[in-house]
Amino acid sequence: MPQTLNDILSALQTAGIPFPKTPDYIENNLNPTFELRPYQIEAFGRFLHYLDNDKLRQKPAQLLFHMATGSGKTLIMAGAILHLYTKGYRNFLFFVNSTNIINKTRDNFLNPQSSKYLFAETIAFGDKKVQIRE
């Protein structure tokens, strides 16, 4: 039976192979009211390990965060976007199965007045400030 990516990453973790630490540019650019939980930090580590490992990564890279409702998947997506921005990506597309979800997600990504706004007040990579726009 073929191993899933989760199986492979779990085996690496069990073998004591460390995953990358969540970079400061992710932590500093996410909304500071949302403290990262241990499993979110692990999700970032797994994401970074997979994305930056040419031997492990399939191309085109396609990932799914299989996490419970309310566990912070959208925050993980925001952090993933921040990382991908450092790799030169500038456009991101979301597919969801309902208008309600896309409207909430849009608000969380684009509206700084939203109680669930995902980013810090200022998003910066070094001296470069970045604006999120639709």
Language-model segments: what does each one mean?
Residues M1-E134:
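RecA-like P-loop NTPase motor core of helicase/translocase proteins
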